[in-house]
């Protein structure tokens, strides 16, 4: 009762609605128990998929200066390289595209159109010509990238001029998205290029471009990107088709 911030007497005086028939009470209790068991079962499967992805990510990128990853798809034997981020990805800044939809960056969720956002975001529509264009699957360095890594555009649109946009000609965005959001990249590679304190922190973009990142042949990047996309789809489907519906049923009951 301490968590509720009310006295024990007041807590036990709360009126509750329940059937008078004990048989009905027991049936409802059994149903809720079954729902809890199902939720636990599917949550375990969901957690297992998430852990599989985490483990595979750890093994599909070379560690500690190694030139090959621990796990590879059949048919790939070339050594991986370490290249500067600025060599793999080119920064671009293209403005005067007010005809494109303004986008909002979602931490860990790509981008959405501002007019589709649940939050009523205010912005000066007269300044849209100063916004930067970003193409689908290109990377965005946004205001909180020092915490969650780089974000990837889900569609073409325009973003705040405070952001930086990058395109990789021979880079599979799904492959690098996983890397750019990894703890290793954020805490070890990116952190030395973050300056300022608290809410004033920013990324030194020129310094970030010097970070050495793994580079594999485009076909191998694509194979890894395909695999990670498949895993993400399984994880999302399991949550949407199994866990959420059961939680909704329990809430209604």
Name each region found by the language model:
Residues 1-253:
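Feature detects amphipathic, helix-rich regulatory segments
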